[in-house]
């Protein structure tokens, strides 16, 4: 049928109006709100049907079988490093393998651990416990009574959710304590005051949780009392994120600290003195790390001018507790940031502080000790330019463990004795051959001119011909840094098969301190997407890859990031893996823990929506745009980021006639599968998709 120019114009206007109405309807009336009922029959049936179609297609990808088999081998390997945790004179470890799918909690002596063959003693078998009790238990950790190291509160989750059941356990008798402390399923927090007393925050009943779903009331709970008989010592507001009490047990004293967090990176702390709470007069975004040698250790997230002195953001400060309570503000500066050098992490031993920094995103390690009231600092040598992860430190002596790795060097565990040098005690297997691979650090220029660093890992035989399958991973939120580390998954499934891997250090993370983070929050959050887009464009300009061969991947906040990137620039990418993502930013604060992140993104129920609506992925999907065939995956039991975010994105894309892939695991919390085999399968699906789209 032939149309005249006038008729064509009328038809074009009509089509535009229909498209606009569709987008408007998507913004105002959400036809997929029913997907927020996590375990409704309708939602689960929808998820099951599309998940089965996705897995069937991905399992037929030629690379899937080999990648999956390799991941099963890696994740179940008995040659993995058993991460140690000091408690008393012992080292504890939680371990999963094919014989212990749910896992075993075990221990050994330090001397035995440092030998080639470790003599382990099983303390609790979670597989046996789950079978006996008929529960889908997933191990979530333990809180020891630190001065005795016999009794502990064990956290067990049903299906991997953040909410846990907590039960008192006797590590000497290796059994749960009869009539011991017990907390039903909730997002509870506990801290031991003494062997017969806990501070507890939990779901005490109606109106005892914050809008974010965390405890707002802290109570002192004595042995023999029912939970309802516990004594309230502090109440926060429902609009706070959480409130709780933590006890620092130190050789010189015991310190009880009550904290309330009105926002994600803001808190007010009180020192409990007798029955009184004394407010610690600190900036609301400062973090009390702990109390050490009768000194407060304080980390600053913003510049602080007080009593004629100026202390920079990202500094670590110390001051005597008594001096501070008397009004003195003459702080000792233990760390002060420099250009592209930022604070990263801190632990303590009996007499030393151990901290790591990031120097242009690579780790350095330092030890501080007091001598005649002066802090003496020394650097602890590392094998190269990579990443340090402080594993565990002893409070009985000055020993500690740390992990070191880089992109091409498998993770090694080092042990440091009292004031000594690192000794390598365990090394992970090399799961891929790095021969011929290269790593460089480049910079992209973002929209506002800021230089954004990224690591480029090139496979053997690499040529800058714009044809390389390239995967960019980024996160960019909550002050979480992305560091150069060894990944057996990336190496074996991607690099060794000829793919290029990119780790982008975009704003929103903590790679260069708190200011790098705050440069991408709330009204500045578009910066997050601009930085990732800049990295993608830089890779194309350098002929590393082209849009046809370029994929992006992110999870949680990173899932929001990659979702926003492909809705804004669908022309740049041919593959998108969005895992356990946020996406519907109009309703995110009403779903599970979403309200706790409003300091990061904004409150959509206020004028903040005026900027949020410009980048919220769900509201910005359009029937007029051509999108890549994106892949979303999530977990039904994720009780942190609601699975409806991923569900709704997929449903909307389907409504608009777009091809999309989706997988929802019925188990697993926000972190993924509940056991190594589930994690191996889920990871293999992602790489099968990437090879399908980018080869």
Feature locations, PLM:
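Bacterial N-terminal signal peptides that target proteins for export
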Residues: 2-13
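Beta-propeller folds
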Residues: 13-17, 23-399, 405-411, 415-419, ...
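Glycine-rich His-Gly loop
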Residues: 96, 405, 473-477, 556, ...
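Secondary-structure transition/capping motifs at alpha-helix termini
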Residues: 113-116, 147, 159-161, 171-175, ...
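Cap/lid segment of the alpha/beta-hydrolase catalytic domain
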Residues: 124-145, 156-161, 175, 180, ...
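Structured core elements
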Residues: 153, 191, 199, 256-257, ...
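Active-site-proximal cap/loop segments of hydrolase catalytic domains
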Residues: 490, 496-497, 503-695
